[in-house]
Amino acid sequence: MAGSAGGRLHRLHVPPAPPPPALPQSIAVDEFEWGMRGTHLQVAAGRLQIHVYNRGMDDHDLAVIDAQGVLHTVPLASGADAVLAVDVSAGPVKLFCSLFAGTPDSHEAKGMAFNVTAK
């Protein structure tokens, strides 16, 4: 029989895989004309702390919709930074600049949006 010696099976001991690293509960986001980038693509569901920096020359804001569907925004002058804390549910979370929302000139339409996934 394959894998046996003298009729006995030898089993390899395979240690259990280590647990996956904990997902972050905070994220840093840079805003600039006309884009956004963040430090993480996945975050922990629950309380999320967002540290946002306006690296652009224009004024912007950061907008995020929390787990209850409430829109939170923080205004950012050029060169400013701020911290926004919101509760997020598991699933996609969109962070965006809400200036000129609903118009063709909205900052979101120009590329100022960043998606993370809460797990």
Label for each model-derived stretch:
Residues 9-28, 35, 57, 76-119:
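Extracellular/periplasmic metallocenter environments
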Residues 48, 58-62:
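Short beta-strand/loop motifs in extracellular/secreted proteins, especially
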Residues 52-56:
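Asparagine-centered strand-capping/turn motif at beta-strand->loop junctions
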Residues 61, 68-75:
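Surface-exposed loop/edge segments in extracytoplasmic proteins
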Residues 67-70, 117-119:
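Short edge-strand/loop segments of extracellular domains
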